Amino acid sequence: MSSLPFLKMPFLKMHGLGNDFVVLDARAIALDLTLERRRVIADRRLGVGCDQLIVLEQPTDGEADVFMRIFNPDGSEAGACGNATRCVASVVMDERKTDQITVQTISGLLESHKAGMSPNGLPVISVDMGLARMDWREIPVREACDTNHMPVGLGPLQDPVGTNMGNPHATFFVDDLAAIPLAELGPQLEHHRFFPERANIGVVQPLGDRRLRLRVWERGAGLTLACGSGACAAIVAASRRGLVDRRAEVVVDGGTLTMEWLRDGHVLMTGGIAVAFKGELDASLLA
């Protein structure tokens, strides 16, 4: 396999409920994607623009069909992205003409399958996002604590639930989500010293009837229209607090995800995906 900065590189622009991705296929050619190049591609003014840059590589695990790497707009590598996993799974399932595949990430193997079509004709994809981890050392946080009531907060956001879904999440519960200035509080909490690896900051308003309203300040990405791993953390946190019984519709800015925290500890996420457009990256973009 050769390694090139590339002259022209095909890409897919995809999204899951508005959580958007640039998908590059490096299964046949190793891409020279430096930190700065990742940032340029993800920049909505200088490049294509996306919430995360996704790079497909050959799997290193014999049980996987594809290896997916995830990069934030700041160039840092992420351990998990549920909506990106569903997008990638749809692409590879169509390639292989199958209804289920296994996606390898740096956090582990994720099984995904087709779950029908949405009312507007978009593919609906389910992914098992793996085990929800709740020990304070696994999230991680700086000091031993009950992760169902973590001693950290800022202003109206207090007493969060900690969850690791391949990346760290702090989920806060409020009565009025619209009143929370998440663009202001999110980055401060993301970088709070309590979280040695930073954290994704989710804010949930319970709506009743097994429905949760969610917004997430994503680590390394900021506010997005949807956050799959944040929705996973939300269903786990709400279940631990007794607000729902392990299953709920999670309403994000871009739509609705169906979430279930299974009895074996895994979290299942289901929702629609779409291909927005196809294009080519030119080498001049990354000069």
Region roles according to the model:
Residues 133-137, 278:
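Short, charged/polar, Gly/Pro-enriched secondary-structure boundary elements
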Residues 126-128, 160-163, 213:
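Active-site-proximal beta-strand elements of phosphoester/diester hydrolases
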